[in-house]
């Protein structure tokens, strides 16, 4: 168990949260949610002991082991991958090191023997005999193959390094598990595995995530950071969202009725207060008026962008036709003989390795050329492309208004500013350099650029990356209303499943040859499809 007592934190005059009394109990998974900048990650750091609060304290149950998903993979550069995972259980790793050091001594004394016996007992109590196999299982489940377990962490790519740190946090069944964005750099199947792992986890989990499907699957409670408080709700994210929206509408409706009643009473009092025959009634109405109080509806720190894709030109019947497409990268065939067509209004998800799906979307956009094959877009197509890597677009000192002007025929500042405003850029924010934007800000700028183009076909590669829950919800709602055609690649299961009715997988045959699978089904159905699981060597989820 972990709890807080009168926990407060502020930086200068800015209060993130104050007097937070909250208890997180075993057997529950708590989704820590809130707008960007509300203090979610900072609250998590307070719980982990990495951030000193302004006042109050964090209380951890006696003998409880707390594990945190760390971000400092450079600290393990010179460590073997499997060993880095074992280091997640500090006490066990310390016992293992001392035990190995004693057994490695050339002159083994009686004192060494006594100490070794103590360590063997502690090693057994900590399930040390199964430690390496458990660590290896975690790594394999997170898509790090066995042959890489003995490599130094510095030899892994950045995505693998992050997954090693996740395995490290999960290792050894900690009593309290703190996870900040654990699904980052995970493929869809690793995310689904993590969902099942946390669903079955018996101890306390507190997690920050922008993945709604993930939060819905793993969370028994939601802890909402808003209004400088941390408020606990039972239920998963969707239940919290629906109930909080309902409660807000009810308070707003109640206030509207009260405001109407106030107007009615004021009008009566003003009209008849000087009328002798009506003075008693006017006095009664005045008394009623004084008793009516409006609910104090505080403005939330949450802000939702306004995402809508207007299509100025209607699509014809022919949207896209391609055949025989092939792409090779560093001598590896990503895909070959890829051919399919897309109809007006059709919404398609691309599945497969990230490298392959990004390569195909880049080819479809015209940004790169295929090694073989051809593709043809319909004459009425106005294409909008969202690349996964948007950094090249922001390698400039232009401010945001001038950055947007590059993509607009209408150069008037008010026109360009209106699109930035839709994506929550206002005032002086529009004057800052495009080169200093955060990942989420860059994505919002790219979406503003897309809206400016009035596309009737969208190619989206990882559009929810770096976005907060509010922006993802706004984008999702905007795409649900989009009448054009769509091809999307994303690890956000709920986002994709809500949009598509067809999945094109850049997969492979049993003997490893690239093959396209064109499947008319929802994304959830695709993920559970037994044939897909068999192709990728995955066990069917219970």
Regions found by a protein language model. Give the residues of each.
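ABC ATP-binding cassette signature C-motif
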Residues: 1-253, 308-542
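Proline-centered turn/helix-capping motifs that create local helix->coil transitions or kinks
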Residues: 130, 277-281, 291-301
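A structural signal for long alpha-helical coiled-coils and helix-turn connectors
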Residues: 103, 241, 270-273, 277, ...
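ABC ATPase nucleotide-binding domains
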Residues: 251-265, 269-271, 278-287, 303, ...
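Short amphipathic coiled-coil heptad-repeat segments
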Residues: 136-142, 267-271, 287-292
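Extended non-transmembrane interhelical loops and adjacent amphipathic helices
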Residues: 113, 186-187, 283-294
């Amino acid at each position: 168990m972990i709890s807080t007592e009168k926990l407060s934190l502020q930086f200068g005059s800015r209060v993130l949260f104050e007097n937070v009394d909250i208890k997180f109990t075993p057997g529950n998974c708590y989704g820590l949610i809130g707008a960007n900048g509300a203090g979610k990650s900072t609250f998590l750091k307070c719980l982990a002991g990495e951030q000193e609060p302004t006042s109050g304290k964090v209380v951890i149950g006696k003998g409880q082991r707390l594990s945190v998903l760390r971000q400092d993979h450079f600290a393990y550069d010179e460590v073997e991958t499997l060993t880095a995972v074992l280091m997640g259980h500090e006490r066990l790793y310390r016992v293992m090191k001392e035990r190995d050091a004693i057994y490695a001594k050339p002159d083994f004394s009686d004192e060494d023997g006594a100490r070794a016996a103590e360590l063997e007992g502690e090693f057994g109590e900590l399930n040390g005999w199964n430690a390496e196999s458990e660590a290896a299982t975690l790594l394999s489940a997170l898509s790090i193959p066995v042959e890489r377990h003995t490599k130094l962490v510095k030899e892994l790519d950045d995505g693998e390094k992050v997954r090693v740190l996740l395995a490290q946090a999960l290792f050894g069944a900690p009593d309290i598990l703190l996870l900040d964005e654990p699904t980052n750099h995970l493929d869809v199947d690793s995310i689904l595995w993590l969902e099942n792992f946390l669903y079955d986890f018996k101890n306390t989990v507190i997690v920050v995530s922008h993945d709604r499907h993930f939060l819905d699957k793993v969370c028994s409670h939601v802890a909402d950071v808003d209004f400088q408080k941390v408020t606990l709700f039972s239920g998963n994210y969707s239940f919290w969202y629906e109930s909080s929206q309902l409660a807000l509408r009810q308070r707003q409706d109640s206030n509207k009725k009260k405001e109407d009643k106030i107007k009615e009473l004021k009008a009566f009092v003003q009209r008849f207060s000087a009328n002798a025959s009506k003075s008693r009634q006017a006095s009664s109405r005045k008394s009623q008026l004084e008793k009516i109080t409006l609910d104090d509806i505080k403005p939330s720190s949450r802000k939702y962008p306004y995402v809508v894709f207007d299509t100025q030109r209607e699509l014809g019947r022919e949207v896209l036709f391609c055949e025989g497409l092939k792409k090779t990268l560093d001598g590896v065939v990503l895909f070959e003989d890829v051919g399919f067509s897309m109809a007006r209004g059709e919404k398609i998800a691309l599945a497969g390795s990230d490298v392959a799906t990004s390569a195909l979307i880049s080819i479809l956009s015209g940004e790169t050329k295929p090694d073989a094959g051809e593709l043809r877009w319909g004459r009425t197509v106005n294409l909008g492309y969202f690349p996964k890597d948007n950094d090249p677009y922001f390698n400039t000192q232009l401010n945001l208004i001038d950055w947007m002007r590059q993509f607009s025929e209408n150069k008037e500042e008010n026109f360009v500013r209106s699109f930035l405003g839709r994506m929550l850029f206002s005032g002086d924010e529009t004057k800052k350099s495009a080169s200093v934007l955060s990942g989420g800000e860059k994505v919002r700028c790219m979406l503003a650029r897309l809206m400016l183009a009035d596309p009737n076909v969208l190619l989206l590669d990882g559009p929810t990356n770096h976005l907060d829950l509010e922006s993802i919800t706004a984008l999702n709602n905007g795409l649900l209303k989009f009448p054009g055609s769509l091809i999307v690649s994303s690890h956000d299961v709920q986002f994709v499943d809500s949009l598509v009715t067809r999945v094109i997988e850049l997969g492979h045959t049993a003997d490893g040859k690239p093959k396209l699978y064109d499947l008319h089904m929802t994304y959830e159905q695709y993920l559970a499809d037994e044939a897909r699981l068999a192709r990728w060597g995955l066990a069917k989820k219970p």
